[in-house]
Amino acid sequence: MASIRSCVSVNPAAAVTPVKYKSARVGAAGLDPKGLRISCSSSSSSLAAGGGDGCRDAGCASSSGRGSGVVGSVGDGWWGRRGGQRERAVAAMCSAGMEGVRHGAAAVASVPAASASALPERAKVVALVAAVMLLCNADRVVMSVAVVPFAAQYGWSSSFLGIVQSSFLWGYVFSSMVGGALADRYGGKKVMAGAAALWSLATFLTPWAASQSTIMLLAIRALFGLAEGVAFPTMSTFLPKWFPTHERATAVGISMGGFHLGNVISFLATPIIMSHIGLAGTFAFFASLGYLWLSVWLFNVESDPLDSRTISKSELQLILAGRSASKIQGSKFPSLREILSKIEMWAIIVANVVNNWGYFVLLSWMPVYFKTVYNVNLKQAAWFSAIPWAVMALSGYVAGASADFLIKSGFSVALVRKIMQSIGFIGPGVSLLCLRFAQTPSVAAVLMTIALSLSSFSQAGYFCNVQDIAPKYAGSLHGLTNGIGTVAAIVSTIGTGYFVQWLGSFQAFLTLTAVLYFSATVFYNTYATGDLIFD
């Protein structure tokens, strides 16, 4: 690898005072082009602004590997005056790999501190992302609960219930593929806002559509899935812009914790709300929560921290220093043929397929499993089904925090992703095999809880791995893999029913799912990488 040498010189100001900037991006960087000189020995190009030899003044530091530099530019908002004195502050970071970047950030020259709130801006961001993911899943579960009174009111057959439930995935499988590309192009803020507005509208219209015709109901449910399919790839694009590499798994864990918590809240709250305000009122209530979130999101979040007017300079520098090397200006999105030619990409695809396969088997059939195998009533089945999802919401955060701790401790990104993914697949596989020995619903609930809790470690495995190998195209590639995974979810959900009908038992299909978990673990550990593949 080429050696990269960075030289920084600083012309100190007579006095350092806060500065107001016309450009949010420039102001956040807080850099003065005059007096800055950066040169890299691995490149024939150099950046120089103003006089003075930076190398003589500041000395040089070198390292090896892939390097990246972060320097403020453009705009005339560089200057501030107080008492006739001019301040100059220069910050330059040039490194080779993530550790080099972080060390470079620690050596940044003094930058005037902007007033900032006590709560980091990225904490607000991840809280809002977790909130919208909670609503995303909660709105799905509303229909799963409401479908029972709907069926009683309109005389739906069991087969039609299956069609209604699957109609959500018809739109989902399409938008999950294109949603990431939209987020990459237009920014996560706009795309997530549009998606939440649309799925909240579809939620509100569902009772009305059911009263009109079956075609109208299926169309509204497909529209609902179309809007929700954007959420995951948009999150995959949005979070890497706001969090350095060593914090991303934690951010994903918190966001996914919100997603799984939405399952629990809606499962338990929907029957209560429905008993007070009816079917239409329940859907309207959850839709209103979406628009309430939207009003907060639009005025408090930007797609990129460089566009934020409230972020502190120190936090911005931390984020920029911890970003993966960005793509060369002017490079094009890789073709589908190029994407599918990379075995590292197939490792992520296979992991996504198997994860979705197992996830939707448990999501769709767990209440039926408890009722059929252990002959419990529907209320008991709902509680036994809710417990695993509640624990999963917490375990996802533990998985993310553990992964980030290992990366900060010096373990390679590839090794950490493989460890997390192994836990996320081997744990559920063993738990599903043990279900054949469960004699009581309580023991089965414990095994289901273990399976789902450990499966959440996949969030710090293959899910974050997309951001490692293609940070610039994370949304698009996650959309592609998630779209393929959604097809697997449709197959597994329908396949479970046929297996139970033919064999009279859930265990055969659960055993097949366990075998897929184990096989995917071997494939992922063999071919996955933490290196940049698409830049």
Swiss-Prot record:
<keyword id="KW-0150">Chloroplast</keyword>
<dbReference type="GO" id="GO:0031969">
    <property type="term" value="C:chloroplast membrane"/>
</dbReference>
<dbReference type="InterPro" id="IPR044777">
    <property type="entry name" value="SLC17A9-like"/>
</dbReference>
<feature type="transmembrane region" description="Helical">
    <location>
        <begin position="125"/>
        <end position="145"/>
    </location>
</feature>
<dbReference type="GO" id="GO:0009536">
    <property type="term" value="C:plastid"/>
</dbReference>
<keyword id="KW-0934">Plastid</keyword>
<dbReference type="InterPro" id="IPR020846">
    <property type="entry name" value="MFS_dom"/>
</dbReference>
<comment type="similarity">
    <text>Belongs to the major facilitator superfamily. Sodium/anion cotransporter (TC 2.A.1.14) family.</text>
</comment>
<protein>
    <recommendedName>
        <fullName>Probable anion transporter 2, chloroplastic</fullName>
    </recommendedName>
</protein>
<dbReference type="Pfam" id="PF07690">
    <property type="entry name" value="MFS_1"/>
</dbReference>
<feature type="transmembrane region" description="Helical">
    <location>
        <begin position="443"/>
        <end position="463"/>
    </location>
</feature>
<dbReference type="InterPro" id="IPR050382">
    <property type="entry name" value="MFS_Na/Anion_cotransporter"/>
</dbReference>
<feature type="transmembrane region" description="Helical">
    <location>
        <begin position="381"/>
        <end position="401"/>
    </location>
</feature>
<keyword id="KW-0813">Transport</keyword>
<feature type="transmembrane region" description="Helical">
    <location>
        <begin position="343"/>
        <end position="363"/>
    </location>
</feature>
<feature type="transmembrane region" description="Helical">
    <location>
        <begin position="215"/>
        <end position="235"/>
    </location>
</feature>
<keyword id="KW-0472">Membrane</keyword>
<dbReference type="GO" id="GO:0006811">
    <property type="term" value="P:monoatomic ion transport"/>
</dbReference>
<feature type="transit peptide" description="Chloroplast">
    <location>
        <begin position="1"/>
        <end position="95"/>
    </location>
</feature>
<feature type="transmembrane region" description="Helical">
    <location>
        <begin position="483"/>
        <end position="503"/>
    </location>
</feature>
<feature type="transmembrane region" description="Helical">
    <location>
        <begin position="254"/>
        <end position="274"/>
    </location>
</feature>
<keyword id="KW-0809">Transit peptide</keyword>
<feature type="transmembrane region" description="Helical">
    <location>
        <begin position="160"/>
        <end position="180"/>
    </location>
</feature>
<keyword id="KW-0406">Ion transport</keyword>
<dbReference type="GO" id="GO:0005315">
    <property type="term" value="F:phosphate transmembrane transporter activity"/>
</dbReference>
<feature type="transmembrane region" description="Helical">
    <location>
        <begin position="413"/>
        <end position="433"/>
    </location>
</feature>
<feature type="transmembrane region" description="Helical">
    <location>
        <begin position="191"/>
        <end position="211"/>
    </location>
</feature>
<dbReference type="InterPro" id="IPR011701">
    <property type="entry name" value="MFS"/>
</dbReference>
<keyword id="KW-0812">Transmembrane</keyword>
<keyword id="KW-1133">Transmembrane helix</keyword>
<feature type="transmembrane region" description="Helical">
    <location>
        <begin position="504"/>
        <end position="524"/>
    </location>
</feature>
<feature type="transmembrane region" description="Helical">
    <location>
        <begin position="279"/>
        <end position="299"/>
    </location>
</feature>
<dbReference type="InterPro" id="IPR036259">
    <property type="entry name" value="MFS_trans_sf"/>
</dbReference>
<comment type="function">
    <text>Probable anion transporter.</text>
</comment>
